[in-house]
From Swiss-Prot:
Protein family membership: Belongs to the glycosyl hydrolase 1 family.
Binding positions for a beta-D-glucoside per the UniProt entry: 47, 149, 194-195
Entry annotated with the keyword Glycoprotein: yes
The keyword Glycoprotein appears for this protein: yes
Domain of life according to the entry: Eukaryota
Covalent S-S links between cysteines: 214-221
Protein name per its UniProtKB record: Putative beta-glucosidase 17
């Protein structure tokens, strides 16, 4: 039902937008949208300021490369402060309110909640997200919470090789359960992973994102295997997603009344020619980039 509702609302937006472009159109108004339509904004944890505050140990996989080699960014900046959301979240919530949005999608920093392995829940991290969620709700803004947006604790990268190691699946299960318990009484919309297809592509095939793993001809990295590792990472991510969804639906959904899903970055491929080879290549690319994650099962022709 969620997929159908989302598709319907997207269709409404597209139709309304096209109508607004027609000659003599008066433009879009809020009352052109159905009651209950959610207008929103979105961020991710690292992009708005990781901040050492609220983290008692370690760090995450995105912070280390810029500490070890700050020159990889031309002006030597990193995301440790960014717009300092950790300290200025009340201002950000007020800005959202003034914009008139009624939903806000943000990601939780895994490293802020569980900076070390099992059992080490960071109370300061829990407290920060409680404050943020409560501030949003007080302004009539529905929180949409993403559990993982490209980042993992650095310790798990060292211990398991990040998403390349099967052990990280249990770690994600524990982390997601902590979040359901801590925030689920107020959060109605959960996302396990943001764009897992981009995680595998840019972290393990092209090596553009930390941990920067790749191999020729896809890129020139210090380590990695672009022909194998994206599949291994995707396998572990999808099993982690499935376990978290099962746990939520089994143990939390009836009481908390929320829903849970995954966000996939959509794109489309067209064959260069009508040849069988090109048609199959386009189909494989679409299956690898989208279908595999949307259907959450391995497609044999990959």
């Amino acid at each position: 039902m969620m997929a159908v509702a989302a598709a319907t609302r997207i269709a409404v937006v597209v139709v309304a937008a096209l109508a607004a472009l027609a000659p003599g159109a008066r433009g879009l108004r809020r009352d052109d949208f159905p009651v209950g339509f959610l207008f929103g904004a979105a961020t991710s944890a690292y992009q708005v300021g990781w901040s050492i505050m609220g983290c008692s140990h370690g760090g995450w996989v995105w912070s280390l490369p810029f500490l070890v080699d700050p020159g990889r960014i031309s002006d030597r900046r990193n995301g440790d402060v960014a717009d300092d959301h950790y300290h200025r979240y009340t201002e950000d919530v007020e800005i959202l309110h003034n914009l008139g949005v009624n939903s806000y999608r943000f990601s939780i920093s895994w490293a802020r909640i569980l900076p070390s392995r099992f059992g080490g829940v960071n109370s300061a991290g829990i407290a920060f997200y409680n404050r943020l969620i409560d501030a949003l709700l007080q302004k009539g803004i529905q929180p949409f919470v993403t559990l993982n947006h490209f980042d993992i604790p650095q310790e798990l990268e060292i211990r398991y090789g990040g998403w390349l190691g099967a052990g990280i699946r249990e770690e994600f299960g524990y982390y997601s359960d902590v979040c359901f318990k801590a925030f689920g009484d107020r959060v109605r919309f959960w996302t396990t992973f943001n764009e897992p297809n981009l995680i595998t592509k840019f972290q393990f095939m092209l090596g553009a994102y930390p941990p920067n793993r790749c191999s020729p001809p896809f890129g020139s990295c210090n380590s990695g295997d672009s022909r194998r590792e994206p599949y291994t990472a995707a396998h572990n991510i999808l099993l982690s997603h499935a376990a978290a969804v099962h746990n939520y639906k089994t143990n939390y959904q009836a009481k908390q009344g929320g829903s849970i899903g995954i966000v996939v970055a959509m794109k489309w491929y067209e064959p260069l020619t009508n040849s069988t080879e090109d048609v199959r290549a386009a189909r494989r690319a679409l299956a690898f980039e989208v279908d595999w994650y949307g259907f959450a099962c391995y497609l044999p022709f990959l």
